A protein has these predicted regions:
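Transmembrane signal-anchor hairpin modules in multi-pass inner-membrane enzymes, especially those
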Residues: 1-98, 105-111, 115-127, 131, ...
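Alpha-helical transmembrane segments of multi-pass inner-membrane proteins
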Residues: 5, 19, 25-28, 46-57, ...
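Short aromatic-rich membrane-water interface segments that cap or initiate transmembrane helices
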Residues: 34-35, 91-101, 160-174, 286-292, ...
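TM-adjacent membrane-interface loops and short helices in multi-pass inner/ER membrane proteins
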Residues: 170, 295-338, 345, 352-358
Length: 598
């Protein structure tokens, strides 16, 4: 009995089922809390990925191991992270381990795809996974209809107003997923999985749903479909591979572009107050491209790279470094503090240095070259490259690969299309390696369980800590939960953010308070925390550093200048308050400021 159960869960098809759930569940899970709105989506993606790794317990896997050469990029990036860690560039060991666990997750998924393709075949896998994406697309379409009805004034039990449309509650992620669902719908139609009227109704529903995302990238996704379809149609004629189907797909992709425009026009004139359309956003921003926020972020990230070209500013440090750079004469004076460069390669350059984007570019070039060399222009290959094109476009404009659900999907798709791998046999008995795999899987289970418990604790104290509404009894439990999260999970940076918000600026344990707040500022640079940091520095007597932090806070939030100039000096010793104001006056090149005792 046990052997049959073990054989089932370690079979390739069962693994594929879990991968299908990884394609579906994270982006159809309507649970979003603070401070990490995507935690549960990322967590369920990691759980499904971990369950799919049970196939590595199979003896058959270890008899003929194939390692994707593309997957080595994740090892290369991990080495850079370790080098930064050893160099003392990373502010948190837990954050470092969390990043390394993401890279290990991607490495294993990439190689899992190679193994599953070897056993199940690309066509069977593509058909199976495309159905999960289409189901996810319809789930989002139904949810958007429900949201629209609620926003129009219809009372729906348990429904609350969300800032955006779509289950994932993030416009660009929503558009990405719906574009992948649309590509999968077209692929399944070409494989005769849908009748004509069901397909066109589905396409109309998906394009309408995409319009509700408001993402300008949707136009790029649709154009990429047409370009891929054109290239495959031309080559399919030469190779006599799915020629009729590709001609049909080309017509559909060309029709989809004007159809998408007509859908937006209809929505604009029927419900203008309930939706912000992609084309509307595109036209409203077309005359201000050079001054856009994204362009400013790219410029500042480039300057950070030039200042730290070899190892970057450190993984996860770009927010803190962009804050410190507000006073730099080499950066544009936009007052921007940001967590990501909104471009994969620029982000890698800024945080990891020049080696990371070079490794990534080489890995991508070799993967594309080998994939193209052995391409037979079938429908499955077109579906695969369409999904990767969507994620690629998104990665050049935002940061989807920093989320476990998109990272997992991307790594698996690269493994699915891998044509270049290293095959070797294990000299010793393969059964000896299975306990090691089991230990790794158990470690993953423990890690995910501890992170779930930690996030529940963090969410519990989120608002009481920010509002400073903790009672004496709650303070004891709050402190206990903080140390539990810090010591037994990888969620320390987020726990520190909650704990830092509850800290009262005073001289009690001041060095410890400063350490916690400074570490928290690497993760979340809010004005309230910066103000508290400056106040603690003033209380400690470090007036020069306090003045510098006050200046950066004012550059970040000019409208709150008066607030920080009034509040922070009150924490300095009474005889030195004017000294602090003189220092900040010198920093700001402002008229002399005077302290007035209330």
């Amino acid at each position: 009995m046990f052997n049959r159960i073990a054989a089932y869960f370690s079979s390739p098809f069962t693994s594929l089922i879990f991968i299908g759930m990884m394609f579906l569940l994270p982006l159809t899970l309507p649970i979003h809390g603070l401070p990490l709105p995507d935690f549960y989506s990322e967590w369920i993606a990691a759980v499904m990925g971990l369950m799919s790794f049970l196939v590595f317990l199979s003896l058959y896997y270890w008899q003929h191991i194939r390692v994707s050469r593309f997957s080595l990029i994740y090892i290369g990036l991990a080495i850079i992270i370790v080098a930064q860690w050893l160099a003392g560039m990373l502010y948190s060991m837990q954050m470092s381990l969390l990043i390394l666990s993401y890279l290990l997750f991607a490495f294993m998924l990439c190689n899992l795809a190679v193994y599953l393709k070897q056993n199940l075949g690309l066509e069977r896998m593509a058909l199976f996974l495309a159905k999960f994406l289409v189901i996810g697309g319809f789930a989002n379409a139904i949810f958007v209809v429900t949201q629209l009805a609620f926003n129009a004034g219809i009372t729906i039990p348990y429904m609350t107003k969300w800032p955006t449309y779509g289950i994932i509650a993030q416009n660009n992620h929503f558009a990405n997923y719906m574009a992948m669902a649309t590509a999968s719908l077209i692929y399944l139609y070409a494989k005769n999985q849908f009748s004509n009227h069901k397909f066109w109704l589905g396409l109309l529903a998906f394009l309408t749903t995409i319009a509700f995302s408001g993402s300008r990238s949707t136009w790029l996704y649709l154009i990429s479909f047409a370009c891929i379809a054109f290239i495959f149609t031309q080559n399919a004629k030469k190779n006599h591979t799915d020629e009729n189907q590709w001609q049909q797909i080309l017509k559909i992709s060309l029709v989809a572009i004007p159809l998408f425009a007509l859908i937006q026009a209809a929505l604009f004139y029927s419900i203008p107050d309930l939706i912000k359309l992609p084309t509307e956003r595109l036209l409203s921003n077309s005359g201000n491209q050079s001054n856009s926020i994204r362009w400013a972020i790219w410029q500042q990230s480039w300057q950070l790279f030039l200042q730290h070209p070899w190892l970057g500013v450190g993984a996860g440090n770009i927010r803190w470094q962009s804050f410190l750079a507000l006073n730099s004469p080499t950066l544009s004076s936009t007052g921007l503090v940001f967590e990501h460069a909104h471009n994969l390669f620029i982000q890698q350059m800024a945080e990891l240095g020049i080696i990371a984007p070079i490794l990534t570019a080489i890995a991508l070039w070799k993967w594309i070259r080998n994939w193209w060399a052995k391409l037979n222009f079938n429908l499955e290959s077109g579906w695969l490259i369409s999904l990767l094109a969507i994620i690629g476009i998104h990665s050049l404009l935002e940061y989807p690969l920093w989320y476990a659900y998109f990272l997992g999907i991307t790594a698996f798709l690269f493994g699915l299309g891998e044509q270049n791998y290293t095959q070797f046999k294990i000299g010793a008995r393969p059964s000896l390696l299975r306990p090691l795999v089991l230990i790794l899987l158990l470690a993953g289970c423990i890690n995910l369980t501890s992170m779930l418990v930690a996030n529940i604790k963090i969410e519990r104290w989120m608002f009481p800590s920010i509002n400073n509404s903790l009672t004496r009894e709650q303070q004891t439990q709050f402190t206990s939960d903080y140390y539990w999260v810090k010591n037994f999970s990888l969620m320390q940076p987020y726990a520190e953010f909650i704990f830092a918000n509850a800290i009262e600026p005073s001289k009690d344990n001041i060095d410890k308070k400063l350490t916690i707040i400074e570490s928290s500022l690497h993760n979340t640079t809010s004005f309230a925390l910066v103000e508290k940091y400056a106040a603690l520095l003033a209380a400690k007597g470090d007036y020069r550093q306090s003045a510098k932090i006050m200046k950066l806070a004012i550059l970040m939030e000019p409208t709150l200048k008066e607030e920080i100039l009034v509040i922070v000096p009150t924490y300095a010793d009474e005889g030195h308050r004017q000294e602090l104001l003189n220092l900040i006056s010198a920093e700001l090149n402002d008229d002399k400021l005077n302290y007035h005792k209330n």
